[in-house]
Amino acid sequence: MPSISTNIILAFTTALLGTLIYRSHLMSSLLCLEGMMLSMFILTSLTTLNLHFSLTTMAPIILLVFAACEAAIGLALLVMVSNTYGMDYIQNLNLLQC
């Protein structure tokens, strides 16, 4: 496995561990999720370029669309929680109460 792929997998693992460690704050969780999506995008792009398979060229773009949707929903949820409770603790977030 080339060193670039190893570094990208290490970045994904670090972001995943960051999500597990800093799961009490919503902003930290969102930043770690964005790091995971960025490393997945780079890994998907490199894999697509190395395969030379024309049908997989849309996969990184589709991944970016999902990452943008995830970021928009996450930021909307962050604004809603911080306006309601004044802090971004995930413990305050209970989706069963509307």
From Swiss-Prot:
GO terms for biological process: ATP synthesis coupled electron transport. Its main location: mitochondrion. Disulfide bonds: none annotated. The chain crosses the membrane at residues 1-21, 26-46, 61-81. It is an enzyme of class 7 (translocase). It is a multi-pass membrane protein. Keywords: Electron transport, Membrane, Mitochondrion, Mitochondrion inner membrane, NAD, Respiratory chain, Translocase, Transmembrane, Transmembrane helix, Transport, Ubiquinone. It comes from the Eukaryota. It catalyses: a ubiquinone + NADH + 5 H(+)(in) = a ubiquinol + NAD(+) + 4 H(+)(out). Belongs to the complex I subunit 4L family. PANTHER family: NADH-UBIQUINONE OXIDOREDUCTASE CHAIN 4L (PTHR11434:SF0), NADH-UBIQUINONE OXIDOREDUCTASE SUBUNIT ND4L (PTHR11434). Core subunit of respiratory chain NADH dehydrogenase (Complex I) which is composed of 45 different subunits. This is NADH-ubiquinone oxidoreductase chain 4L.
